[in-house]
Each structure stands twice: as structure tokens, then as C-alpha cells.
Amino acid sequence: MSERNQRKVYTGRVVSDKMDKTITVLVETYKTHSLYGKRVKYSKKYKAHDEQNQAKLGDIVKIMETRPLSATKRFRLDEIVEEAVII
């Protein structure tokens, strides 16, 4: 059980749910510039496994690192933090 706590966990926004059992999650992080100290925003997209196809476009989700599930999938959906409001 202690090994499971060492897995990376990211929170991001679902930007694509068109694939079957797969979502694309955009994770935004801030890094401080080493010389100037300014915080710079970085973003990266991760593909995550969604077994029940429950996450929808715009949802805020938490993804957890797992074994390689395909050529590009290394994460799985852990929980839906906030559902998107459709207007």
C-alpha cells in the first residue's frame, strides 16, 4: 500500500472525451524562473483511462499514474472533482 502513495496525482480539466474509455486532461502548473523569480505557467496534456466513460468535456478531474495501458496512456481517472456546468 505504501507504493501506491508514491504515484503521481494531477488535477486538470478534460479537453477531449471523444475516444472510447479515454480522456485527454490538460494539467496546468507553475514554475518559478531560476534567475528572475517570475512564475511561469506551463500546461501539458495527458491521456487517461476512463473505464465507465463518466468524465465529460470541461470536468475538473484527478488522474493517477498507473502501468502503461497503451502507447500513450500512463494515467487513469481517479475521481471527478467538479462537473462542468453546461449553459
Swiss-Prot record:
Keywords: Ribonucleoprotein, Ribosomal protein, RNA-binding, rRNA-binding. The keyword Isomerase does not apply. The keyword Hydrolase does not apply. GO terms for biological process: translation. GO terms for molecular function: rRNA binding; structural constituent of ribosome. SUPFAM superfamilies: Nucleic acid-binding proteins. InterPro entries: NA-bd_OB-fold, Ribosomal_uS17, Ribosomal_uS17_bact/chlr, Ribosomal_uS17_CS. One of its GO terms (cellular component) is cytosolic small ribosomal subunit. HAMAP family: Ribosomal_uS17_B. Part of the 30S ribosomal subunit. Belongs to the universal ribosomal protein uS17 family. One of the primary rRNA binding proteins, it binds specifically to the 5'-end of 16S ribosomal RNA. This is Small ribosomal subunit protein uS17.
